[in-house]
């Protein structure tokens, strides 16, 4: 019988990887808590119209990449390709915006039918932040600073913050006309992809990965030149606030985001450690999205980072600096104690002891194999536990267990009284019992 495999681009996270992800998520949760954010969780499956209206029908995401099907109720449904539209839909549906500004964060899997490669899968995980109902330029800088501080705290190397202003809808319409006219005069130099986008989504040509197109665009008019006086002044305020926060940034007049709802400030944080997939975090202002989805005009700003790319960066950083924060985050979680036991009476005693020590807060791995002691000790070594608690029928009869330090092969196992183990709340207590 053929062995079943996961779908292409749908990757399993094995226990060691999951522990690393949990460590990163814990750091993110702490940053969000200190910034006063609240978590929101939305369904994986939404009506297709949400993304068609929110993201834009002319985008690659809606046109090429979504997982869409018609369900048994004859409704067109889509696995969410990003998180922002779902968060805004939930805020509208449940009246959150009537309660004042909302500072929300989310995390979970998204789905896009793309060509899988390192750091980019068809099921991918994002952690994102959405500030709804907050419209000042200062809030742009605040939310960007939250992303920057988190990535720095995680130990990511080679970070570069790029910012741009996409202006208002009127600014973009004016620029679109100028850009289309400029590109039409050079249509013979465009590749097939750029020709397709010329009249549907010309701003996306600015983000072309074709080196020839990138070189051609060096002489193209920039969006900044088309911005109104008000849009330029607003963008200047964002830059002043980032400077006040001592966050280095670069202006990138070619920076556009792949979703139609962005306007005014847009940003990306890249790393020189990622190669072609350099962007680790991106976002911006999307003041028109709430209204597009049926709500009142509401300012909003948000960002998201992809966990897969972030983990690639942390693994790279850990290899560069084995003592840094990234190395600590990507290290496997070690059990405090591995319980080695054999014999009918010993196994029951070991079960009770493991339960008591876990309740006291220790990380305890119990060997339930019933195999020979030497095999159990080999497994204890592979677990990377610091200590082994050894119980045989003889020890159980005497009311003792033996504690062995696993980091030195020659260390003797020292007896400790079983009836004292319930007092323990950390491994230091184990060592203290041995000395007593």
Curated annotation (Swiss-Prot):
One of its GO terms (cellular component) is cytoplasm. It comes from Prochlorococcus marinus (strain MIT 9303). Disulfide bonds: none annotated. Keywords: Aminoacyl-tRNA synthetase, ATP-binding, Cytoplasm, Ligase, Nucleotide-binding, Protein biosynthesis. It is found in: Cytoplasm. This is Histidine--tRNA ligase. Belongs to the class-II aminoacyl-tRNA synthetase family. Homodimer.
């Amino acid at each position: 019988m053929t062995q079943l495999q996961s779908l292409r681009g749908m990757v399993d996270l094995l226990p060691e990887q999951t522990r690393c992800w949990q460590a990163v998520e814990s750091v993110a949760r702490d940053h969000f808590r200190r910034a006063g954010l609240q978590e929101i969780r939305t369904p994986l499956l939404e009506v297709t119209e949400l993304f068609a209206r929110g993201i834009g029908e002319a985008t690659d995401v809606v046109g090429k990449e979504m997982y869409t099907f018609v369900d048994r109720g004859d409704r067109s449904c889509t696995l969410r390709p990003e998180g922002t539209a779902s968060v805004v839909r939930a805020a509208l549906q449940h009246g959150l915006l009537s309660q004042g500004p909302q500072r929300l964060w989310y995390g979970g899997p998204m789905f896009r039918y793309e060509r899988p490669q390192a750091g980019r899968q068809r099921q991918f995980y994002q952690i994102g932040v959405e500030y709804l109902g907050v419209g000042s330029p200062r809030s742009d800088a605040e939310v960007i600073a939250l992303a920057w501080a988190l990535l720095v705290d995680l130990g990511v190397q080679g970070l570069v913050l790029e910012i741009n202003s996409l202006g208002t809808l009127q600014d973009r319409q004016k620029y679109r006309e100028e850009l289309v006219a400029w590109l039409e005069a050079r249509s013979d130099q465009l590749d097939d992809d750029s020709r397709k986008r010329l009249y549907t989504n010309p701003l996306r040509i600015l983000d072309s990965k074709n080196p020839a197109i990138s070189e051609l665009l060096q002489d193209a008019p920039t969006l900044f030149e088309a911005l109104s006086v008000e849009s330029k002044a607003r963008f200047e305020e964002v830059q002043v606030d980032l400077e006040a926060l001592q966050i280095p940034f670069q202006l990138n007049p070619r920076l556009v985001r792949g979703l139609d709802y962005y306007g005014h400030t847009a940003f990306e944080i890249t790393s020189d450690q990622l190669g072609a997939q350099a962007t680790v975090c991106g976002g911006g202002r999307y003041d028109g999205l709430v209204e597009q989805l049926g709500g009142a005009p509401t300012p909003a700003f948000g960002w998201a980072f992809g966990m897969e790319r972030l983990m690639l960066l942390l693994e790279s950083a850990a290899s560069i600096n084995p003592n840094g924060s990234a190395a600590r985050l990507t290290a496997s979680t070690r059990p405090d104690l591995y319980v080695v036991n054999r014999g009918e009476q010993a196994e029951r005693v070991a079960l009770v002891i493991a339960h008591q020590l876990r309740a006291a807060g220790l990380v305890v791995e119990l060997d339930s194999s019933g195999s020979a002691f030497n095999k159990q000790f080999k497994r204890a070594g592979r677990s990377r536990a610091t200590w082994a608690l050894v119980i045989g029928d003889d020890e159980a009869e005497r009311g003792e267990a033996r504690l062995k330090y696993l980091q030195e092969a020659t260390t003797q196992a020292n007896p400790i009284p079983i009836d004292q183990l319930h007092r323990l709340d950390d491994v230091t207590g184990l060592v203290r019992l041995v000395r007593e």
